[in-house]
Amino acid sequence: MSASQPALSLIKSLAYMDGRWCEARGGRRFEVLNPATGQLITQVPDMDEADTRLAIAAAHRAQPAWAALTAKERSNKLYAWFELIMANQDELARIMTCEQGKPLAEAKGEVAYGASFIQWFAEEGKRAYGRTIPGFSGDRRLATIKQPVGVVAAITPWNFPIAMITRKAGPALAAGCTIVIKPAAETPLCALALAALAEQAGIPAGVINIVTSHQAAAVGNELCSNKTVRKLSFTGSTRIGKLLMRQCADTMKRLSLELGGNAPFIVFDDADLDAAVAGALASKYRNAGQTCVCANRILVQASVHDAFAEKLAAAVRSFKVGDGMGEGTQIGPLINAAAADKVASLVNQAAAAGARVLVGGQAHPAGPLFYHPTILTGVAPDNPILQEEIFGPVAPLVRFETEAEAIAIANDTPYGLAAYFYGRDIARVWRVAEQLEYGMVGINEGIISTELAPFGGIKESGLGREGASEGLEEYLETKYLCFGSIA
């Protein structure tokens, strides 16, 4: 491997099922490439429906014994996993940068962020409380208990290849569920590295299973249609989420769906502009704009629009673009050619519809998957770029006059994942926070996700919540007990 792609002991080239490292039954494999360099990292098994059924069966066999452990015993296993993840933070970050492309500093941050979900749910699993209920007659006693859903399927994306796994596996395992994980074909190596560390932590065979595959439709259909799987957790596009939801309907699976976003970022005239610029930079450009909660539309009140645009442009022009392994890199590559083509097309369409390119607006010479960090001004509310999740380092600026206009523009979307706004008038802060139709709102803050708070959206941005106590509830069933003949 090259200097930018070092040999790493946690890179695995086999799938992980039932405590074994294994090939696909048919012997097929697919390549995992470094998006910054185009170099081959390794090949992994290309598993199909039959392989997936084996993984589900392994999870089913392991689930009763795992659920029978006390919450504290499961907690101890999860803590051991958490500690191993943090002990291997540097290597996990290098694997992530190699296969996903994000700058190494961001990758290290994601490893710590991802590990925090394991740590949090190691504790929260001990608090899966039932309750007692006053009876409806003197000889009755009523209570509820919590029990694990059972076998869980998780389909995870490439943009956060560690955190999106731990945010699902942490609560699932803490609740007493077992899990079958289908990571994105672009980033299977982070998932396999996590499995290797889980194995070292003493998590039993069959509790965690990793199905690597380039056959997303076939594997997804098996996970959705198989009666043994009692819950599906998916992070990805709204289009695919709707498809999976339909496929799960026949077996009435529990669902957690974290889907697309179209996040507004509103700057009011009383905002601290320096803080707003810092928030916009963090929210818009991390991971080269490839996050579901990225600021997708930046709405700036007319009286401060030009000053904000000037400050933002100065910062964006200074970004260092390149291989994520490079010293000081701030913007890495897009994940693949389709992503790069989409970003270029959206910028061209926006310009054709009247937007002006203030910064960037073209491919970057670092390589075919790199795009210049871009700012567009003069973007009308009906510009096509405001209707799509950009998933790239492009910030469209929209000028507005009044609070009511900003809220109307912000809510004019079928999505409702995250929103952000900056302002200091306390009355307006409350009004706007309540009127924005989003599951999460950052107020004078551009980075809002944490294991401590419930993450999720409304409208077509999904179902359920991840993180916090709500995240554990997603993997538990409530059973009602009625005791008679007590008197």
Model regions: which residues?
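Hydrophobic face of amphipathic alpha-helices that form TPR/SEL1-like repeat modules
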Residues: 1-36
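Conserved C-terminal structural/oligomerization subdomain of aldehyde/semialdehyde dehydrogenase
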Residues: 37-43, 229, 266, 320-321, ...
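Glycine-rich loop-to-alpha-helix module at the N-terminal edge of alpha/beta enzyme cores
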Residues: 39-128, 139
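Rossmann-like NAD(P) dinucleotide-binding subdomain of oxidoreductase/dehydrogenase enzymes
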Residues: 130-275, 400
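Structural signal for hydrophobic packing residues in well-ordered secondary-structure cores
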Residues: 63, 67, 82-89, 93, ...
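ALDH superfamily catalytic-core signature
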Residues: 239-380, 443
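Short, well-ordered beta-strand elements within core beta-sheets of diverse protein domains
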Residues: 41-47, 62-68, 154, 265-268, ...
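Residue-level signal for inorganic ion chemistry
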Residues: 38, 59, 74, 96, ...
